[in-house]
């Protein structure tokens, strides 16, 4: 860069001064790296979102909206139900669910009950599900009442791989008209769920209690139960 006069130099200095003033209001990178925060479990962040955004939509599933308050209530009820059927610290809960509101609810409910979430791909074969369940020590699994999934889960439950199977209703997750159409035209895709142990419906699980017992979780050491 070539300066032809003192005026050019003064102009550059003026620009640098303006830039420095503008940067004064920004947080230095070194300070950003030293920000302090209080570690909390993941479900506590959900509770904070519920308290802050209660009436706002949290999930839109095929046109059916769930607000934060509703999601919070569903998580609490499901967590309380999980505790009643034996979920506590160290207990593994498998989620063999597609992308539905049930996944969000049961994920946070498991953590809030003190359990550890183990994700299963619903497209896994029966053998793959069994191998993962045994490897992870999963005896409680959450699934959807679609034959595509339940045909595999049901066989494993019959062989004693799962001690509890929590069944979620696809129809109940859909908005009114779609639920009706699903029942009329897609009924053959639904599995027949035995009304006996080890099965329990999501609705029945959530009706056991409304609030879970508090569980002490250290988010710095209890990594699997964040």
What are these regions (language model features)?
Residues 37-38, 47, 55-100, 104-108, ...:
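Conserved AMP-binding/adenylate-forming core of the ANL superfamily
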Residues 20-28, 45-67, 223-224:
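AMP-dependent adenylate-forming
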Residues 31-40, 183-223:
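Flexible, low-complexity linker/hinge segments
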Residues 51, 87, 217-221:
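Short, flexible hinge/linker loops that cap or flank conserved catalytic cores
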Residues 2-12, 112-204:
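Structural core segment of the AMP-binding/adenylate-forming
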Residues 5-18, 36-58, 73:
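A short N-terminal helical cap/helix-turn-helix that marks the beginning
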